[in-house]
Amino acid sequence: MSRLVVVSNRIAIPDGSKSAGGLAVGILDALKNTSGLWFGWNGEISEISGEEEDDLNLMEDDGITYASVPLNQNDYDLYYCQFSNAVLWPALHYRIDLVDFQREAWDGYCRVNDMLAKRLQPLIKADDILWIHDYHLLPF
């Protein structure tokens, strides 16, 4: 059976502090059944950009590999707050009146997607099934 690789904006790293919700509930069994990989942002704002060699955090839990990277404040603001939330979310929910497009945010959105794709590439196997989740990763 092929391994499922889920790529999402943010991953639910198991730490025992709270129960999984949202996307995690729907995919944990599928990831477990395929010895899957869940890749994305770890939710941390860091001084490093996610592009450093040593900032990829890999851990295994209950048959699932979790691979995550941090974002720096600038990338978080541009990619997540200003483009994903202020452009894509309103546009994809029929609220064009709320869209606030700024070229710098688009550049940040593309830069973070490119960085994530480059960080994921060495972790991918030829027969993996990729699931790219949600609008945060459209250029992926």
Predicted regions and their residues:
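N-terminal low-complexity, Ser/Thr- and acidic-residue-enriched intrinsically disordered segments
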Residues: 1-75
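An aromatic- and histidine-rich active-site surface loop
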Residues: 130-140
